[in-house]
Curated annotation (Swiss-Prot):
Keywords: Coiled coil, Nucleus, Phosphoprotein, Transcription, Transcription regulation. Component of the chromatin-remodeling INO80 complex, at least composed of ARP4, ARP5, ARP8, RVB1, RVB2, TAF14, NHP10, IES1, IES3, IES4, IES6, ACT1, IES2, IES5 and INO80. Probably involved in transcription regulation via its interaction with the INO80 complex, a chromatin-remodeling complex. The modification Phosphothreonine is found at residue 507. Present with 1400 molecules/cell in log phase SD medium. Residues 64-80, 493-504 have a biased composition (Acidic residues). This is Ino eighty subunit 1.
């Protein structure tokens, strides 16, 4: 009998006989031959697990390959299977012994990951070239409008303490109306202290509490309906993952890391061109809220709900923006736990197919087809948020319901079913039922002609602006290269060795002379020694009679340094403009600004004169306060009594110095008492505390 020896090169166990000189450890070919002979006999295959043979034992490696980028990979699958890992050799099943082996074999079983069929949250962003507008269909305008128009006051107002000292509420006569950001009479002061709020009211109030929200934007969000509506629409698109942080809505944006896109439905009738906030700023506002912004794990929450419903309490613990972020990040959990159970897709074509199948097929086959049709028509959260194939009213109803059960209930099955009955308008005790998500063929998001024209004009203006920016950059680059360009000459003469300073000065003087409208003579600088002499001819310009209403136009000639061709450049004289500005300034100064017929300068002079007593009084009070509250220790340090350690004075600390400081403080009090008791008319006594 031989003994098994591990072969580290081939990662197999070989059989070595002690008495035979022919079979050695360094010659594995014989063991391979004997192994191949035994593989051919069925008896050897059956006794493989019981007795030790000379067959080399292959090692099976399980390699996990990510198949996400399988389409782009040019590497063959055979190259991936030749990977040797430092795994311990394992026993081969009997099925693997049927194949013949020519040597020590290492087989690897490749296990591929299934490709993701559903859309990822990272490829849902709106992507268009720079300058292309976002139309109504891109931003799902009808869906956003239905969300912000919802009148149900079902969300608890947890923002009262944040607005307690900053807003004065306005009382509405009669019954309380739910005013949303879609209403023309919108004013957040009418509902900021209500106990219950609508979705739009809670959303806009939450945005206004952000730490990154400026004072101006906060006031506009609370008082301006146009700003509040447009900001809520864009914030919702960022919140659900439809807009990434590389989008700007200002036409003259120059950042290379951003792309400009107009939104005609929000910008057409806007007065401010900078009405819309860019998406990086919106993301910063949404992520920096003062409360309820903690990390939320819906998976752990659902596990706690399944274990014990009583221990989970998520009511009023998170803000609505953070909750919407978490719902979109965990779309798979939402689909499995809620949408598959409580949402049913309904379409007319599907109903007709179901009726025909029930009439023709048996009952058992019909039931199977029903289940298959339900699975085929199953919807996801991203389908509801991104696509317009469903009714906007149904989509908004489902999204508000998802936010409601996560913010206002403990997510138990009883409360979830009760919320379904409430949203469907059913009575208590009735079956919970499901949400009906109706398919539609109607195109709700149709752009009118004026919005299409606005988007086209914005695209054209953007291209013109970018072309001007590119021309400016090219002009700057050419100017820099011309200044740094060395002088061109055939031979290096003495003029070439004058130094870089002289050349730079000459080029600067030359460029200055080029900008003047005077005729340019032939340059005698070293730069033009070896060039052909060219006599420049200025284009004749007919002088026009200057008037006050028309601008005087003069032509200046600029020399092209390559061929010395003259290109006329129009230069506008701003004398007429200056005269207009002077007239406007004089009219503004002579304009009567008060009821007494006084001009602006006279009114300012009277105002300064009336404020003189108050200014003197403030001056006196300030001087007395400074003199009274000024620390004595710096004074003592100046006099040389104390050291330079400016600590607060303590009794019986330094003896003589302590007595001196006490005397100084007492003298100050006596002096101040005399000044306070003195008469106000005595100017000589109080001259030191008054302005002369």
């Amino acid at each position: 009998m031989g003994k098994r020896v591990y072969d580290p090169i081939h990662d197999t166990f070989q059989l070595r006989e002690d008495n035979s000189d022919e079979t050695k450890a360094d010659s594995p070919m014989q063991s391979v031959k004997s192994g191949s002979q035994e593989e051919a006999s069925p008896s050897s295959i059956q006794s493989e697990t019981e007795t030790v043979t000379t067959k080399s034992i292959p090692v099976i490696h399980e390699i996990e390959i990510d198949d996400k980028n399988d389409d782009d990979s040019t590497q063959s699958e055979e190259e991936n299977t030749n990977i040797l890992l430092n795994f311990e050799p394992s026993t081969v099943p009997e099925a693997t012994g049927a194949s013949t082996a020519t040597g020590p074999v290492t087989t690897n079983t490749v296990r591929r990951k299934p490709k993701e069929s559903n859309a990822s949250k990272y490829n849902r962003h709106l992507k268009k070239p720079d300058g292309e507008p976002f139309n109504r269909k891109d931003i799902q305008f009808s869906f956003m409008q239905e969300l912000l128009m919802d009148k149900r006051q079902i969300f608890t107002n947890v923002l009262k303490p944040l607005y307690k000292n900053s807003i004065v509420p306005i009382n509405i006569d009669g019954d309380k109306l739910s005013i949303n950001v879609t209403d023309k009479e919108y004013d957040a002061r009418t509902f900021v202290f209500n106990d219950k709020l609508t979705f739009a009211q809670l959303y806009v109030l939450t945005i206004a509490t952000s730490i990154k929200c400026s004072k101006i934007l906060r006031d506009k969000l609370l008082l301006d309906q146009q700003v509040a509506f447009s900001t809520c629409v864009l914030a919702l698109l960022v919140n659900i993952g439809r807009l990434n942080t590389t989008i700007n809505f200002y036409l003259e944006m120059t950042s290379q890391l951003r792309t400009f896109h107009s939104v005609p439905v929000l910008q057409l009738h806007a007065n401010d061109p900078k009405l819309l906030q860019d998406t990086p700023r919106l993301k910063s506002i949404l992520k920096n809220l003062p409360w309820g912004n903690e990390q939320l794990s819906l998976m752990e929450t659902y596990k706690k709900v399944d274990q014990n419903d009583g221990e989970v309490d998520t009511v009023n613990k998170f803000n609505i923006i953070n909750m919407l972020f978490s719902i979109c990040d965990n779309s798979g959990l939402i689909d499995k736990r809620f949408l598959s159970k409580y949402v049913e897709v309904e379409s007319k074509a599907q109903e007709q197919d179901m009726v025909d199948e029930q009439n023709e097929v048996k009952e058992t086959e019909a039931e199977n087809e029903k289940q298959e049709s339900k699975a085929a028509y199953a919807t996801t959260l991203f389908d509801i948020l991104d696509y317009s194939k469903y009714e906007p009213k149904d989509r908004s109803n489902i999204l508000i319901w998802l936010l409601y059960i996560h913010l206002e209930t403990n997510l138990s099955q009883e409360e979830v079913e009760e919320s379904v009955r409430f949203f469907n308008g059913l009575e208590d005790g009735a079956p919970a039922g499901k949400f009906i998500l109706r398919c539609t063929e109607r195109s709700y998001d149709t752009d009118p002609e004026d919005e299409l024209e606005f988007g086209a004009n914005q695209r054209i203006k953007r291209r013109e602006f970018m072309s001007k920016m590119e021309e400016g950059r090219k002009r700057e680059r050419t100017n820099v290269t011309e200044v740094k360009k060395p002088s061109i000459g055939g031979d290096k003469s003495e003029e070439d060795g004058e130094g870089e300073d002289d050349k730079s000065e000459e080029t600067v003087e030359e460029t200055r002379s080029l900008l003047t409208p005077t005729p340019i003579l032939e340059s005698s600088s070293p730069m033009t020694l070896n060039r052909k002499k060219v006599t420049p001819q200025l284009p004749k310009v007919t002088p026009a009679a200057p008037t006050e209403t028309e601008e005087e136009i003069t032509s200046a000639a600029i020399i092209d340094k390559n061929d010395l061709n003259l290109t006329p450049l129009k230069k506008y004289n701003s004398s007429a403009t200056v005269n207009k500005v002077d007239k406007l300034i004089s009219l503004d100064l002579n304009k009567h600004v008060s009821e007494n017929g006084k001009t602006q300068e006279e009114f300012l002079a009277d105002l300064k004169k009336s404020q003189v007593p108050n200014r003197l009084k403030r001056r006196d009070i300030g001087l007395i306060k400074i003199f009274n509250e000024f620390e004595d220790i710096p004074v003592a340090s100046v006099l040389g009594i104390r050291g330079k350690k400016r600590k607060k004075f303590k009794d019986n600390l330094l003896g003589f110095e302590t007595d001196f400081m006490k005397n100084l403080g007492a003298s100050k009090k006596v002096l101040l008492n005399k000044i306070e008791r003195a008469e106000i008319d005595d100017e000589e006594a109080t001259a030191m505390f008054k302005l002369e």
